Structure formats: C-alpha cells, structure tokens
From Swiss-Prot, chain B:
Residues 56-67 have a biased composition (Basic residues). Belongs to the peptidase S1 family. This is Transmembrane protease serine 7. It comes from Homo sapiens (Human). Gene3D superfamilies: Low-density Lipoprotein Receptor, SEA domain, Spermadhesin, CUB domain, Trypsin-like serine proteases. Residues 27-67 are annotated as: Disordered. Residues 606-840 form the Peptidase S1 domain. Expressed in brain, ovary, testis, salivary gland, trachea and lung. It comes from the Eukaryota. One of its GO terms (molecular function) is serine-type endopeptidase activity. Residues 247-360, 365-481 form the CUB domain. Its EC number is 3.4.21.-. Keywords: Cell membrane, Disulfide bond, Glycoprotein, Hydrolase, Membrane, Protease, Repeat, Serine protease, Signal-anchor, Transmembrane, Transmembrane helix, Zymogen.
Length: 381, 843
C-alpha cells in the first residue's frame, strides 16, 4: 500500500518541471554551509511558492532571476500554468484533513508610502491566497508586532515571534510560514519512548526522548552515499523519510542530495522488518532568505536594482526582508494504535542482526507528499 | 665446496628461472613497475639467459676475469639470495596475475523479458539462424547496449544476448534476453538487482497523456508492465545460450486436446534440462506431472521449476517442486508459453520426470447462479483450471441469488477456510464477499462459510506469489434464522454437529469448538449410552466417577480400526498404548523400539527462568542462521529435529544452506556437535497470518554420533491425540531473551517451569487459538518463552515411566511474560502422523 504510494510520488514534478538547477538542494547546501554545525529546516515547496508569487510583481531581469533561480525556464504561457499549479497545490494543502495540521501562507507587508498595484494584490489573493498589509515601518516595534501577531493568528499560535528584530528602513517584507503536524499511519507506543543518548558529535552527548516501534518499514541502504533511509508514512499521502548517514559521512550525504537521489531512494525502497528508534522532537527553521538566495542567483529583488514595477509604481522599492519559518513536530501519535489487539501477537524467533535502526546521531529528514514539503537536518533534537 | 658441485647446483636453478620467465611473458612487463631491477648488485652468474637486462649486462665480464675465486661462500650466499628473491618475485607476480584474472572473471547474469508492441511475430523468428531473428535480436541488443552503456553501470556492462523471440497472447513480440555484467568481485556488493531493472524501466519514456503502459525504449515500443529482469545463474545462462544444450528441448504445441509427453530420466551422471513450451497464440499451457524422482533437499541441488516465461526468470516462477512425488499435479501458464527446468546435477539413484503438457483455452472464472429454495448443497465452484493449481494474479467473480429473502448462501470448503482480513495481507487468496474483506487459508479439515443475505457477490483474487493448490467449494442455500438444524450445535468451523456430541471429549467439529467452554468433558458414563470408543475412553484419565471409562482397557477384544494391536495380534481398547510408558501387551511389543530419552539426568533445572545445569535438556538444539542463534529445536531422532515453521518463513530463511544445528550445547557457541541442515520440511498448511500449523521438521546433514548419547538424546513424541491436563507442570527451555525488552538472547541455556493452561481459557484470552495450539505459562506472567526460543521444546515428564514428552513447540505470544497472556505452543500430539510420514523410523 505504501509501496504504491511511494511509486506515485513525483517529487517536485507536479508544480516545478524538472530543472537544470536543483533549487531545493542548492538551497539546502547554501543554508548548511552558512551554519555547518546547526540544524536546518525549511520547506522547499513553500519557498518556491513565495518566490513564484513575488515574480508576479517583478519585471525584467529581476523576474528572470527568480524564475531561473527556481530552475524554471518558462515561456509566458507556461508561467501561467506555474501559478495555476501553485494555486491548486495551495488549495489541496489547505484542505482540512483528519489528523493533519498544516498551515502554510504568505503575506506581504509594505510601507505606507508604497501604493500597491491592484492587479498584483488581486493576483496574490486569488492565486496565492496571500494578504498584503500596509505597515508603518517607522514604528518598528509596532510593525514587528503586527507581523508576528498575524502569523501567530494564522498558525493558531504554533509560530509566534517570527521576527526577532526589524530594521526601520524596511519597505517591503515578505513573510512565508509553514507549520506541520500530522499523525503517523501507525502510532508509536508511548510506553516504548525512553530517554536515550543522542550523539551530537562523538564527544557531545544529549539525552533525548527516543520513540521506538517495530514494524515493516520501507527501507534501503544507499552504499554510494553511505546512509540508511527509512520511510515512515503519515496518515494520508505524506511520508517522512529519515536518513541516517554512516558515522562521519554527513557531508558526503549532504553533497549527494539531489532530486535524482530522492527519486532513486523512493524507487529502491524495500519493505523490511525494523526496530526503529527515532527521537521525539520539534524542529523549526527560521531564515532571512534575502541573505541566502543571492548565492543561488536570485539577488536583484533584494537590491536597489529590483524591478518590482508589477507591485508598485513607486520607484526604487526592493524586498528588504524575506522571512521563512518552518515548524514540524514529531511525536508518537498516529491514527492507528500501535498496539491494537490482533496485531501485536508475535512469533518468538530471534531477530536477525542489523534490524535495529537507531537515529542517535545527526540525521536528515524529508517530508514528501507530491512535493518536498520539508527538508532538514537534525543535529540536536 | 668445489667448482663442479656448485655448477651442478646452479644449473637446475637457472633452468627453473628461465622456464618460468618464458611461461609468463606478461609477467615481465609488470616486473619493472612493481619491483625495479636491483641496481648495482653484481650478479656473477655465468653464461645464462638473464631474466632481466641490467643483470645480464654485468655478467660476462666478471665471469671471465675472476673465475676461480669467484665461487667463494660469500658469493654463493649472494647468488642464492638473489635466486630466492627472483623466485619470490615471479611467484608473487603469478599469484597477482591469477588473482586479478579470476577477479575480472566475476560475471553477473541477468535474465529478463519485455514485450515489443509494434513488431508482429513472424514464424521465422523461431529459427535462431534466420535473417529475421538475427535482425530483430540485433535491434534489441543495440537498444539494451545503449541503455546500459549510458547508465551508472556502463563500466561493468559486458553484453546482452537475445535468447528467444516469441509470440504471445497480448500481441506483438515477447523478447527474452540475458544481460551480462563483469566486475571485480570486491565491487560486487554495489551491484543491486533492483538497480539494474530500474535502469531499464527508467529508460522507457511513457507518455502521461495517453495513459497506456507502452512507452518508447530508444525507439522500440515497449510495454512497461511487461518488463521483468532478475539476476540469474551462470549455469542457466550457458545452458540456454551456449552450444551445450544437453537434454534441453523446444516444443511447439499446435494441436488442442493432444498430450505432448515430457519424459526424461537417468540413473547416473547429471540432468540439467530446459524444456521450452510454446502454444498457439490465444491459448495456455497446462503441464501435468505424473511423477518426479529427485533428491529431496529443498531444491538446493535437485529441482523442478516451472516458469511463466521462456527464460529462468525468478519472479516469473509458477511453481517449484523440491521433493519426489507420485501424485498427479498440474499447473497452468498465464501466457502461451512455459519453461520447465529439471535439475539433478549428481544423480545417485534414479532421477527423472514423467509428465505431459497440453494446449488449453483461457477460462473465464465467473458465474451467476440462481440457488433453489431447498436448503442444502447443490453445486460447486472452484478455482480457475480446477483441478490444476491455479496461477497467480487470477480473479474470479461469482454471484448468487436465492429465491427467498430468508435464505442465505453457504459455502462448504474441503480443506480451506476464510476468515476476516486483518491488517496484514492475505497469503492464499483474498476474498471480497458483499463488500467485506476476508483472507483464505488451507487447512486439514472442512469448514462452512455462511453469508446471511439472499444476494451474494463474491470476488476471489489470488494473492499467492506462486501457483496455489486447487480449491473446490460446494454452495447452497441455508435458513438465515437457523443455520443449523434443531438440536445441533454450530461449530466455529461452521459445521453443524448433534448437540449430544458437545463436550463428549470427541473433536466432532474438527476445530475443537464443541469441546470448549465445557464444565469438564463428560463421557456418557451410564450403562445405556456408554461409548466403547473415543478419546476419553482408556486414555489414562479417569473421567467417569465410577471409573468405567478406564476399565477393561487392555482386555483382549476383536480387532477393529479403533483398537490397538499388539505384536502377537492381540487387540484391546487402549488406543494410545504405543510407547506410553506402560507395558500393556502381554509380549511387551507396545513398548518396543521406543528410542526416546528416559530422562537420563535427574530433574535439574527464558523469562523468569534460571540457568539450567549442563546436560539437563539433551534434546535441546540451537538453530543458527548465518552464524547467529535464531531459533530452537528438539532432537527426535539421530538425524531429525522438530522446530517451528515460522523460523523458516521467507526467502532466505527457507533455504537450508545458511542454517546449522547446534546439539549438546549449554553455553551458546560451545556445542558438542554441529551439523549443517540438509532439508527443511515446513508443514504445508503453515500460515504466518494465523500462526496456524507452526511446525517444521529438519533433517541434519550429519547424524549425531552414538558416542555422544550421554549428551544428546531424543525426546519422545507424544502418542497421537494425547490429551493434556490443564495445570500440569512442564518446562520450557531456550537461549532466547530473558526479558521482553532485552535485545539479546541468553548465553546460558535457560529453563522455566510453566503450567499447561486450559484450552477454553487459552481461546478466550487470544481468540485466534486453533486446535493445533496450546497455551502454557503462569497467569501472573513472569515465566514464559520469549524471542529466540521459538521452535524449542515444551517438555513434560510423564508420570507413568518418567519419560520426557515433547508436548509443545514454542510458537508465539503477546509480548513475553505479560500477566494473563500465557505463551502459545504448537500442539505436537496433533502432528504425529505428519511426523511419521517423514520420520518413519520413530515407530
């Protein structure tokens, strides 16, 4: 059943056609090299969406940079399709589902002096369900409160304090947030969760609540990249992939990440009985994308060279900040009880070796449905 | 030493050197690279062909100048050292060459097939020398070359060979081919079977728009769904491609209702035959096997394999036969072709097959039946191609309608049962009956399944990987409000038995449900209806207050099939007299030849267990899979062990070769006797979903020696249908985990005393208990078997003679040692005839 689901995944294919550039993984590497020993967590689909939205208001080379940066080389007609694709995806993602909490949104906060083009505002609203807010950036504390309150409200309090500080010279701030919590298809047993050591490095050890469940998982050992990958399905279409690099091989795995690698993993998954040990954690990533995206070729929009004529007639406006925040909680809860009667009766043969998979050192994590919802590295749960 | 001597000693050495250096021409090329010639060392060898140039140049001058003083001791030592050195270099080079040569020869063979949709079949394709065949195979080879030479495995890709091009029932061409990869053995591990197949599948460009499975593979129109590619054997490659065809044959079956014989046998030598059968398009092939003569060893050496293709592609196997058989069995293909391979590489006695095949039309498995309003069974439904084994991926639909809304539909199966589908998949048939899901499983008795609705829609989908046993069911209507006649009891198996037979100690329902929830089984003890026979009579347990059921048990009466017959033809009522520890026959023949252990050692002593004393359980065996302890087993004879079927469930586990049996062991790893396993016999009705029939026999490759009989002893098999009394104390032993949460098994053999639990309590605890299972433990938990103990013995000591009886086999449970969840064991007394079928020497 899961195999079928895995086969049906077209990672990154539904919206963004396969690209020359690998936006998702280049962005990952850019974030990783900026903060090598820290956890990383972001939502590629959400960032792509917010950039595509921005491109609606961009012109000339600013727009080209965004589209090319996303790995798209589009004709006018297919640009329309791109936006429509995102519109559809947003509608799908925002649909309420059992045991599935996802809040994803974009908002643009512009200074009072900026007059917005009506066409842009309505396109944002209809295609991206995004709001624009006039903001008095000269009162930076007030502006920050306005932005943070908005996001907190939208995420039902799951993301508070999006901004920690705000530059009073800001004119346009783009905000992109995503919160995700879903139930596993089969829950982990609370009783099986125990404090265990997690080796942040070989010297640094922290205690983490470690969940455990023995089950049939989709599993593979990638010998090329030296890592083990296990797929744990959520209720519905999403699946979490946890990637455990062999000791000392994190860098190698990070360098090998690509859409092709991900496809290969999904294809090579085999069902296997495993004793899985996974930390219970909540991970978040908060990024000032204006500092990272220029290394991926998207730079103009954040400088005075920005052509944002589609957003406003006001000359010389630029996106001062582009804030992305992604939050995911991982715990035991699942739709189906792990210990439902009738399923927990087990044969008493011994286990074969190498059937324990313990995520007790830094690992990578994907959450995919039809797109890569999240990508991250957990250095310290 | 004088000159002559030294000359003599030098000459043969020189010969050797030149001999070798001439033989290994290529070695010299490598020599300078690996070991540069020794610079500046003077080599005073007279007049020889030098193995290396710099050495040779220096020689002649020295020799002529200083002839006599030259052969001093020092020079001789130098000479000898150099000689040794050269010899070592050459030997090393040879070794290196040998290793690199054998390494590079490590080839990987893949057998596969796919369907090309845009080329029509021509009769010429049957001729491998024809222009047409050569042309189409060249095209396919070029395409495969292109696929793999541009893939990640291009470095290792050697070639592809088209083996067969055939017609098929879906149209177009079915191409069978081999792909060969060559790589150093050290790199073999990076080679995964799935990757090779994925490369081919990835190369097929399917169009999403027209939504067919046909895509373009480098210009060929290939059906994506038809692509199969598996790792194959070198021997299969050479016998299907090579010139040595041996006993291999092609058959083209063009005539319906004709039996094409397939017979081959040999009394010595080897048989490795591939029979390729091709029928006319639109038809299928049925292979009927009359008898097979092979060595039984789980197909390790001898096998008969039936493929749903023309090449030995593993995932298209329809069936495998690993044991000799004389019962007629038949198998049906899903296409117009079939491959039958017969392998017997070392014929010791007689090996051979007697079979025939025929061309049959495809059958639709569907039917709509109007059932008459009389209640009873009136017709039959069966699996496709009954009585043949039915091929995988089949689908049947049946619709039934009764004439009255008060009548439902009843299905009576002969050796099959359908039960609600759990979260796990179905192994032997997936049933959808009026929108409810069920799984089917085979068993050794009848069952009746009732659908309380006048309109019944049934769909059966085959879920087995291989062909499955033929299935037959009788259908009829029944009264929904009263499924069983008045005065009868409805068994869990669905059968109806007279109420009077409930709780009489006789398993009338076959599933024992008529003997559960009884106050205590009561045979009719009063004179009028006293039954002279039955399990409660003369079973050693006093069931009647007046003791009547245990009277006159060994009094001679006329023989019939319910009496026990002594050696001197005297018969009496006590049926389980054989080896029960009491001499009943006047001539003592009932206790003759009972070889099992009369507990050598006095009772010494898992979860809540204690260390045993060494030698306390001489029948206990530890089964190691690829070197690590995986299950337990019990010694029942010199070469046979009894264990649990689930220990051998799965591709790798079912192969006997990775297994070793450790006998006479106390501390893990210190066995007195270790033998590889020659053969594993898993019960044919074993079902991993229902835990039923969890029993397996193992034959050792080497019988344990008589000299170890102090340390290794067989345990007794219980008499057929032996009754156990709840509360009886027995022992479970093993090297399994000592706590549920442990990760490893115990080092020292553990033992725990457990009580046999009343079957009714066992059924009410677990629900899914069958008559093949029994519960043992203590209700407070704490003492139980656990992971790693499976297959091991539940040993009970018989009071009458002090012998140890193998009452149960560790099978399953809810966790381990949890309160109110006793361990579940396979009830050995239900399998005595089955054990005797394979181990006749036990009686």
């Amino acid at each position: 059943e899961m195999k079928k689901r895995v086969e049906d995944l077209h990672v990154g294919a539904t919206v963004a056609p396969s690209s020359r550039r690998d936006f998702t993984f280049d962005l990952y590497r850019a974030l990783a090299s900026a903060a090598p020993s820290q956890s990383i967590f972001f939502s590629p689909v959400s960032i792509s969406m917010s950039l595509a939205m921005l491109s609606l208001g961009a012109g000339s080379s600013t727009k080209m940079q965004i589209l090319e940066g996303l790995g798209l080389n589009l004709q006018k007609s297919s640009e329309k399709e791109l936006h429509r694709g995102f519109q559809q995806l947003l509608q799908e993602l925002n649909q309420p589902r059992d045991g599935f909490q996802l809040s994803l949104g974009n908002a643009l906060f512009t200074d009072l002096v900026v007059d917005l083009q009506d066409t842009f505002v309505s396109a944002m609203k209809t295609l991206y369900l995004a709001d624009t807010f006039p903001t008095n950036f000269r009162d930076s504390a007030g502006a920050m409160k306005q932005i943070n309150d908005y996001v907190a409200k939208q995420t039902k309090g799951k993301i508070v304090d999006l901004l920690k500080n705000l530059d009073s010279n800001a004119v346009v701030i783009m905000v992109n947030y995503i919160f995700f919590k879903a139930k596993w298809e089969t829950s982990f047993n609370h009783k099986g969760t125990q404090e265990q050591d997690f080796y942040v490095t070989s010297e640094t050890v922290v205690r983490v609540p470690m969940m455990s469940r023995e089950d049939q998982y989709h599993y593979l050992l990638d010998r090329n990249l030296s890592c083990r990958v296990v797929g744990v399905p959520y209720q519905g279409n999403a699946t979490a992939l946890f990637i455990l690099p062999s000791e000392g091989k994190m860098q190698q795995v990070e360098n090998g990440l690509s859409e092709k690698t991900l496809r290969k993993w999904l294809k090579m998954f085999k069902k296997r009985q495993l004793e899985l040990y996974l930390p219970k954690f909540s991970i978040e990533g908060s990024y000032q994308l204006e500092k990272v995206l220029p290394s991926l070729g998207i730079s103009n929009v954040f400088t005075s060279h920005a052509d944002l004529s589609g957003i406003s007639n006001h000359s010389n406006i630029q996106v001062s900040e582009m804030v992305h925040k992604a939050v995911v909680e991982v715990d035991e809860s699942g739709t189906r009880a792990a210990a439902a009667t009738g399923t927990i009766f087990t044969f008493r043969s011994a286990r074969l070796n190498s059937q324990r998979l313990v995520f007790n050192r830094p690992f990578l994590m994907f959450i995919v449905d039809n797109n890569i919802l999240f990508l991250g590295k957990v250095n310290r749960p | 030493m004088d000159k002559e001597n030294s000359d003599v000693s030098a000459a043969p050495a020189d010969l050797k050197i030149s001999n070798i250096s001439v033989q290994v021409v290529s070695a010299q090329k490598k020599l300078p690279v690996r070991r540069p010639p020794l610079p500046g060392r003077r080599l005073p060898l007279p007049g020889r062909r030098p193995p290396q140039r710099p050495i040779g140049k220096a020689k002649p001058k020295k020799q002529s100048k200083k002839k006599v003083p030259f052969w001093n001791v020092q020079n001789k030592i130098i000479l000898f050292t150099v000689f040794l050195f050269i010899l070592a270099v050459i030997a090393w080079t040879l070794l290196w060459l040998y290793i690199s040569k054998t390494e590079s020869k490590d080839a990987f063979y893949f057998a596969g097939m796919f369907r090309i949709t845009n080329i029509e079949f021509l009769p010429e394709y049957r001729q491998k020398e024809s222009r047409e065949f050569l042309s189409v195979s060249r095209t396919v080879q070029q395409v495969i070359n292109l696929v793999y030479t541009t893939s990640a495995f291009s470095k290792f890709y050697e070639q592809s060979v088209v083996a067969d091009v055939s017609s098929n029932n879906k149209g177009g061409l079915l191409v069978h081919f081999w792909i060969v990869f060559v790589m150093p053995r050290a790199k073999g591990h990076i080679f995964c079977e799935d990757c090779v197949a994925a490369i081919l599948k990835d190369s097929i460009q399917t169009s999403i728009i027209n939504r067919t499975s046909v895509g373009s593979l480098q210009g060929l129109a290939v059906d994506m769904d038809s692509v199969v590619l598996n790792a194959g054997l070198r021997s299969d490659y050479s016998s299907t491609i090579g010139s040595d065809k041996g006993c291999s044959q092609y058959f083209y079956a063009e005539h319906l209702s004709l039996h094409y014989p397939l017979e081959i046998s040999a009394a010595s030598g080897r048989l490795m035959c591939h029979f390729k059968l091709v029928a006319i398009v639109g038809y299928l092939i049925r292979l009927s096997i009359k008898s097979i003569q092979i060595e039984a060893d789980n197909c390790v050496t001898d096998s008969l394999t039936i493929y749903d293709s023309l090449l030995p592609i593993r995932s298209s196997i329809l069936y495998r036969i690993c044991e000799p058989t004389r019962t007629l069995m038949s198998f049906v293909s899903t296409n117009n072709l079939m491959l039958v391979t017969f392998k017997s590489p070392h014929i010791r006695r007689l090996s051979g097959i007697r079979a025939y095949f025929e061309v049959i039309p495809e059958q639709k498995c569907e039917n709509t039946v109007l059932v008459k309003d009389i209640t009873g069974f009136e017709g039959k439904i069966s699996s496709p191609y009954y009585p043949s084994y039915y091929p995988p991926k089949c689908k049947c639909t049946w619709k039934f309608q009764t004439s009255l809304s008060t009548l439902g539909i009843a299905l009576k199966f002969y050796n099959y049962s359908i039960t609600k589908k759990s979260m796990k998949g179905c192994e032997h048939g997936w049933w959808e009956i009026n929108e409810h899901m069920y799984c089917g499983s085979y068993m050794d008795h009848q069952t009746i399944f009732r659908v309380p609705s006048p309109l019944v829609h049934i769909q059966l989908q085959c879920s087995s990987r291989l062909s499955d046993k033929p299935l037959l069911a009788e259908y009829g209507s029944y009264n929904i409000s009263q499924p069983c006649p008045v005065g009868s009891f409805r068994c869990s198996s669905g059968l109806c038995v007279p109420q009077a037979q409930r709780c009489d100690g006789v398993n009338d329902c076959f599933d024992e449900s008529d003997e559960l929830f009884c106050v205590s089984p009561q045979p009719a003890c009063n004179t009028s209806s006293f039954r002279q026979h039955g399990p409660l009579i003369c079973d050693g347990f006093r069931d009647c207050e007046n003791g009547r059921d245990e009277q006159n048990c060994t009094q001679s009466i006329p023989c019939n099939n319910r009496t026990f017959k002594c050696g001197n033809d005297i018969c009496f009522r006590k049926q389980n007299a054989k080896c029960d520890g009491t001499v009943d026959c006047p001539d003592g023949s009932d206790e003759e030849g009972c070889t099992c252990s009369r507990s050598s050692s006095a009772l010494h002593r898992i979860i809540g267990g204690t260390d045993t004393l060494e030698g306390g359980w001489p029948w206990q065996v530890s089964l190691h899979f690829v070197g690590s302890a995986y299950c337990g087993a019990s010694v029942i004879s010199r070469e046979w062990l009894l264990s649990a079927a689930h220990c051998f469930h799965g591709n790798r586990l079912s192969d006997p070769t990775p297994w070793t049996a450790h006998l006479g062991m106390y501390v893990q790893g210190n066995a007195k006797f270790v033998s590889p396993v020659r053969r594993i016999v898993v019960h044919e009705y074993y079902n991993s979903q229902t835990f039923d029939y969890d029993i397996a026999l193992l034959q050792l490759s080497i019988a344990w020696p008589e000299t170890l009989k102090q340390l290794i002893q067989p345990i007794c098999i219980p008499p057929t249908g032996q009754r156990v009394r709840s509360g009886e104390k027995c022992w479970v032993t093993g090297w399994g985990r000592r706590h549920e949460a442990d990760n490893k098994g115990s080092l020292v053999l553990q033992q725990a005393e457990v009580e046999l639990i009343d079957q009714t309590l066992c059924v009410s605890t677990y629900g899914i208990i069958t008559s093949r299972m029994l519960c043992a433990g203590i209700m407070s938990g704490k003492r139980d078997a656990c992971k790693g103990d499976s297959g091991g013995p539940l040993s009970c000591r018989r009071k009458s003679d002090g012998k140890w009886i193998l009452t149960g086999i560790v099978s399953w449970g809810h966790g381990s040692g949890r309160p109110n969840f006793p361990g579940v064991y396979t009830r050995v007394s239900n399998f005595v005839p089955w054990i005797h079928k394979y181990v006749p020497s036990l009686l």
